[in-house]
Every structure is written in structure tokens, then in C-alpha cells.
């Protein structure tokens, strides 16, 4: 093996270059790689956290939508019950009003019947008195009596 001075010089230069690289070049590269891996890890952690928050938000939204649907259905059911109650109340009021109007009409009809009967009694009494007067004024024979009765029938 032939060793010459160039080989030793190259070895010394290589060792100086290796030492220089280890001392001045390698630490900034390692720091840059560490920072980059830390940023990537932080980004992944933030992405996981964001995904978890998004899932939680979706769950909250789904729960709130379900609650809103339930509330809406409950309000609709309550409104239907109130509408039915109001309709029943209106129906009951209308029936009561109709019964009152019918009773009032019956009372008025009864009053008119009573009034008509009283008027008829008065007229019949007046006609009877008038007929009796006419009978007493005339001579009482069979034909005159029949004519007076027919005339009274016609007036009635």
C-alpha cells in the first residue's frame, strides 16, 4: 500500500469539513427539521381538535334541531287543542244562542196566540151581543132567525 501525503491531506481536510459541518451546518438543519416536525404535529393536533369540535357542533345542531322539531310539534298540538276548544266553545255559545232565540220566538208566539184569543173573544162577544141585539130588534120568526145566523156566520 502506497500512502502518500495527499491521502493524509485529504483525510485532514475531510475531518475538518466533517467537524465544520457538525459544528456550524448540522445544528441549524436539525433545528429546522425539529421546528417543521413540531409544526406538523401541532397542525395535526389542531386538525384533530377541530374535527372533534366539528363533531361536537354537529351533535349539538342535531340535538337542537330535534328539540326544535319537538317544540314545533308540541306547539302545533297545543294550537290544535286550543282551536278545538275555541270551536267547541263557539259551538256551545251558538247552541245556547239558538236555544234562547227559539225560546224567545216561542214566548212571542205564545203571547201572540194569547193576544189573538183575547181579541177573538172580544170580537165573538161583540158579535154575539150585536146578533142578540138584532134578534131582539126584529120579530122572531124562523126565516129571519136563519138569515141572522147566516149573516153572523159570514161575519165570523
Curated annotation (Swiss-Prot):
One of its GO terms (cellular component) is proton-transporting ATP synthase complex. It is found in: Cell inner membrane. The keyword Transport applies. PANTHER family: ATP SYNTHASE SUBUNIT B (PTHR33445:SF1), ATP SYNTHASE SUBUNIT B', CHLOROPLASTIC (PTHR33445). NCBIfam families: ATP_synt_b (TIGR01144), PRK05759.1-2 (NF004411). HAMAP family: ATP_synth_b_bprime. This is ATP synthase subunit b. It comes from Burkholderia vietnamiensis (strain G4 / LMG 22486) (Burkholderia cepacia (strain R1808)).
